[in-house]
Amino acid sequence: ALVSRLMELDLEAFRRVERVNVEGALLTLAAAGRHLKAQGTGGDIVIISTKNVPCPGAGFGAYSSTKAACHQLGRIASLEMAEFGVRVNMVAPDAVFGAGPFKSGLWATVGPDRMRARGLDEAGLEEYYRSRNLLKARVTAEHVANAVLFFVTRQTPTTGATIPVDGGLPDATPR
């Protein structure tokens, strides 16, 4: 993760984040779309977005802006792929926490910068994210997986939609 205010943001560091979040999504959507179209049976694509799309944070410009572009690519893909029976939806979690074998290795990378940016230790960072949502929920990978499962089990005829998995962040998602 890259924590930097826009005025100090290194362009090459930004481009690394952009290549993963935007170019990676574009290439994946294009390849999956071609495959699912050729297969002729339709299908589902679920993009893991972020609460940072509707509610970015200061110092997280590279992440927030590139994930917003990724999210928008998903919305465009939903328009372009619907005629082939392909549904494209997004899941937008806040910070996802786990323990033991369910703890994401991502936090080893992004956690220290986020902790420094907020002046918190690991327990304090988790409490910060938990305490700011309406349900005071600790968002876990299982919560995110359940939202993905909702889309891919085709319980509703939905494409181009976003499910927030954030415990109810008042400023992140129109409710």
Task: State the predicted function of each range.
Residues 9, 56-64, 76:
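Active-site loop-to-helix junction immediately N-terminal to the catalytic Tyr of the SDR YXXXK motif
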Residues 50:
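Residue(s) in the substrate-gating loop at a strand-loop-helix junction
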Residues 20-40, 78-79, 153:
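Amphipathic alpha-helical dimer-interface segment in Rossmann-like NAD(P)H-dependent oxidoreductases
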Residues 96-132, 174-175:
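A glycine/serine/threonine-rich, flexible loop-to-helix segment
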Residues 29, 66, 74:
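Active-site helix of classical SDR
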Residues 7-27, 46, 70, 135:
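Catalytic Tyr-X3-Lys loop
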Residues 134-165, 170:
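C-terminal substrate-recognition "lid" of short-chain dehydrogenase/reductases
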Residues 82, 87, 158-160:
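Short, small/polar-rich loop/turn modules that mediate ligand/substrate recognition or access, typified
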